Structures are given as C-alpha cells and as structure tokens.
C-alpha cells in the first residue's frame, strides 16, 4: 500500500502511480491512499507500506508502530531533501517566504522527517539522496529512479512521429515541477547562451 502525503499531482504520478505500475508489471498488486484517509484497518490487507512524502500524524505514527509489531515492512519514499531544514533553509525560494509561510513549510519538513525515522527502510531516486537519507534510518535505502509510465512512452513516441522538425533550431525543455528547482536551471543558462 502506498500512502501518499503529497498534494501536488506530478510527484504522486512519478513516485506512487509509476511505482505501482512497475509492481503490477512484475505480477504484484498494489494500491494507494492519501495519508489523511489511512486507517489501521488497512494493516491486515497488505504486507508492505510505502509512505511517500508523508508528514507524521497520530494515525501515521500508530500505523507504523502496528505494522512493525506485525512484522510488516514500512518504507519512506522521497525524491527530494525536504526532510530537514538544514537542506531546505539554503533554498532561495524558501528563504524568500513570509514568516508565516516558512513556519508552515518547516512544519511539513519536520513532520516528514519524523515519518522517515519511524520507517525501517527508504526509497529514493539518486545516489546522493541515498547517502543523505542513510543518515536518518538504520535500514536500507534503495534507489528506484523516476521513470516514464507506459502511457507517457506511448504518447511521446506518437508526438515524435507527428512533429515537424526544424534543423536550424535546438529546443530544450526543462520541466522540474518544483519552483524550488528554478535555481538548478539557472546554473546551466550561461552554457546555453554560448
């Protein structure tokens, strides 16, 4: 069971829906639920649980404790270091937040870290994130990179066939999905201008 703690649609697509598709392709079954709809009754229907960007709540805390009691495995999945203010405080966008917004944002960051530390293992997208997350849990930190779904691949192939190419132009698309990543693209702009 994937427990989604993210309100944005694109992270959920890559880290929940696409991983469910991967599991189904291997003959397994999987479902998802938004974290505020999680119920202790769901413990009896699944052997493993993946908490994606899930902030701690009393229900989440009790659920993980009960899962551990029944020898069921809990993973925390995240594709960004929004689990500790030592990482997020350096982001320009976060620094420019109003005091009220920053307080709310930091509360979410700290609550996600608490869920992370209660889980036995973690799943992330890169080696660098793996190394950082290992500082917070005793179990394994596995890498499962973001991938395109079967539908995305099919649509991309159709779009490639339909496009009229202009050999005199180079078109670059950057789709980070997060305003906090704008600084990342700024790093390559000087090279692109050349």
Predicted feature residues:
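A short beta-strand/loop micro-motif in the catalytic core of glycosyltransferases
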Residues: 50, 118-126, 175
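Active-site proximal beta-strand in glycosyltransferases
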Residues: 68-97
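Conserved catalytic-core segment of nucleotide-activated headgroup transferases in glycan assembly
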Residues: 2-28, 146-194
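Membrane-proximal helix-turn-helix segments that form the acceptor-binding/catalytic region
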Residues: 65-69, 99-122
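A conserved, positively charged/aromatic
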Residues: 43, 90-97, 113-118
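Short N-terminal targeting/anchoring amphipathic segment
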Residues: 42-59, 73-77
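A short, well-structured beta->alpha microelement
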Residues: 24-42
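Helix-loop-beta element that forms the nucleotide-linked donor phosphate-binding surface
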Residues: 118, 129-150, 155-157
């Amino acid at each position: 069971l994937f427990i989604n703690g993210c309100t944005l649609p694109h992270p959920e697509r890559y880290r929940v829906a696409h991983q469910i598709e991967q599991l189904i392709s291997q003959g397994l079954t999987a479902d998802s639920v938004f974290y505020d709809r999680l119920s202790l009754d769901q413990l009896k229907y699944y052997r493993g649980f993946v908490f994606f960007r899930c902030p701690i709540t009393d229900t989440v805390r009790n659920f993980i404790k009960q899962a551990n009691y029944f020898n069921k495995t809990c993973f925390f999945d995240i594709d960004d270091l929004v689990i500790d203010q030592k990482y997020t405080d350096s982001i320009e966008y976060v620094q420019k937040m109003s005091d009220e917004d920053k307080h709310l944002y930091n509360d979410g960051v700290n609550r996600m870290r608490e869920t992370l530390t209660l889980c036995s293992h973690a799943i992330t997208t890169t080696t660098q994130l793996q190394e950082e997350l290992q500082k917070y849990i005793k179990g394994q930190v596995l890498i499962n990179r973001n991938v395109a779904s079967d539908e995305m691949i099919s649509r991309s192939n159709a779009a490639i066939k339909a496009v009229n190419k202009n050999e005199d132009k180079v078109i670059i698309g950057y789709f980070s999905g997060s305003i906090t990543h704008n600084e990342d693209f700024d790093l390559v702009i000087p090279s692109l201008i050349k």
